Amino acid sequence: MAKNTTKKITSIGGSALIEGIMMRGPKRTTVCVRTAPDKICNEDISINTIPSKCKLFKLPFFRGIAGLIDSMRLSYKALMLSADKAIESTEIEEEPSKFEKWLDDKFGDKLVKVMMVIASILGVALAVGLFFFVPSFLFDLSANVVPAFKGDGGNAVFWKSVFEGVLKIVLFLLYIIVCSQMTEMKRVFMYHGAEHKTIFCYENEEELTVENVKKQSRFHPRCGTSFMVLMLIVGILVGLFVPVAPFGIGFLRPVFKILLLPISCGIGYELIKICGKHDNAATRIIAAPGLWAQRITTKEPDDTMIEVAIEAIKAVIPEDGSDIVSK
């Protein structure tokens, strides 16, 4: 794994969108979307962050919980905006069906937002079922043929936590591998690579040009993919403290693990920050699984994508240098 040898570390981060990139700086968040071969649409977005309302969430551990929630809120808002821009820039030549006309009459301009909300709700429900209840159910089935899995003592808790954790990681990797085979998602992953490369270029204090960005690494230690992988790994340890059948009810174990998600989130966030700031043997070991997963969630971008990423990061770089974490 390549060492992090950047000349400075910035707090600027971002996420890949549909034909675009969101960049978030300390004072400004902007969404840049390519709407035509020679046109990039730039629009600022904002939210009232949790730490701005409650100082508790500025403290270590708690800031990770707030950071995840705020990032999801911003990403959702940015995704909605990029989807709108992408639709506006696409000419629909086919005659809409009767069902499409009915939807348009009922929802009008809000149709895309309604569909996104429905998709988000279904996505969350699927994720909860797939990553919490399915692993627990499969372990219980396996207990019929694996003696070590039986009972509710310490050994059973250990094996159930390991079984569930490893299965979650496998399911997560399979999910992103399947996504990477879809044409639209391939382009999103390419934009993801452009985002990382551009941030690295800025941290290396090189001029933000397409050629300079191209030569940067697309694997960044402070990435949402790395955060997800770390959360899954930390979740294995957290699971050791949850009984196989809380109060004698096996169904409650995944419920308890969902309630304990903030703990995994807070620890994972702090580990990501440490890996981003320090480069030593310990941090490289911690960061390795996430960087490996980024080989799936990032792809080499083309020049047009890099141009979008450059415009996005330029828009959020503060003149006072308040984004610099260390140098």
Give names to the regions the model predicted.
Residues 1-90, 94:
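Divalent-cation
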Residues 92-146, 156-182:
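Hydrophobic alpha-helical segments characteristic of transmembrane helices
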Residues 59-81, 164-189, 261-277:
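Hydrophobic alpha-helical membrane-embedded segments
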Residues 124-150, 231-256, 269:
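Juxtamembrane "helix exit" motif at the C-terminal ends of alpha-helical transmembrane segments
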